[in-house]
Amino acid sequence: MAALQQTPITFQSRSPPPTQIISGPTAKLSFSGGLKLPKLTIKLRSNRTSRRGGGAAGSKMVASAAGSYANALADIAKSNGTLEQTTADLEKIEKISDDEAVFNFFVSPIVGEEKKRELVDEIVSSSSIQPHVANFLNILVDMKRVELIKEIVKEFEKVYNTLTDTELAVVTSVVKLESQHLAQIAKGVQRLTGSKNVRIKTVIDESLVAGFTIRYGNSGSKLIDMSVKKQLEDIAAQLEIGDIQLAV
């Protein structure tokens, strides 16, 4: 992690190596989220890249490494006074990395670092990412740790929430909720937790049928379930009739 802590203002990544020549069958990289990507080509692979290590020990190592990167980035954001903007940047990056093609491109061992940096540059310019976050992404490319990005985002959220006395509430619903409804939910979570601030993250899940759920607390340990799915499950349990299947 020494490379991340060389300066309190910016990250510095290594100079890009010569372009790696890729031979064999190729496919154009596309992104379903609407991001305009550079014209890059990657070699097709028959196996899918895994996002996780195996076992409890592997999970602990991933969490530890992600926490170290997240804390280093948080130190930079604090010194720059950009905690809020950095959090927003990481949320953008997390959504982009959800695309399987983008993620597999970044973690592929047969794609050269120069090509990966081209993709970083495109993401940075199209999503208005701050320079220190862009440098952070390039460091992950240098260190071959891009697969940790989602864990890093989670760890950074924890650091941000601690620094700002913020409670994170994840609201899951069938359809997008209106802003006034989310504001009411935020006030309710604030009363329950006593936190100074509440951040709302929204998730769409059609399996809930109707209503919504709210997860908050340490690692989302507390749940308020106001969904029709939960009500139907409770009714089924009381009647001992098993799962209720709804006609679509």
UniProtKB/Swiss-Prot annotation:
InterPro entries with a match to the protein in the record: ATP_synth_OSCP/delta_N_sf, ATPase_OSCP/d_CS, ATPase_OSCP/dsu
Pfam families (alphabetical): OSCP (PF00213)
Keyword check for Ion transport: yes
Protein localization: Plastid, Chloroplast thylakoid membrane
Superkingdom of source: Eukaryota
Major location category of this protein: plastid
Keyword entries, A-Z: ATP synthesis, CF(1), Chloroplast, Hydrogen ion transport, Ion transport, Membrane, Plastid, Thylakoid, Transit peptide, Transport
GO molecular function: proton-transporting ATP synthase activity, rotational mechanism
Similarity field: Belongs to the ATPase delta chain family.
Entries under NCBIfam families matching the protein: ATP_synt_delta
Oligomeric and partner information: F-type ATPases have 2 components, CF(1) - the catalytic core - and CF(0) - the membrane proton channel. CF(1) has five subunits: alpha(3), beta(3), gamma(1), delta(1), epsilon(1). CF(0) has three main subunits: a, b and c.
Record function comment: This protein seems to be part of the stalk that links CF(0) to CF(1). It either transmits conformational changes from CF(0) into CF(1) or is implicated in proton conduction.
Name of the protein this chain belongs to: ATP synthase delta chain, chloroplastic
Native source species: Nicotiana tabacum (Common tobacco)
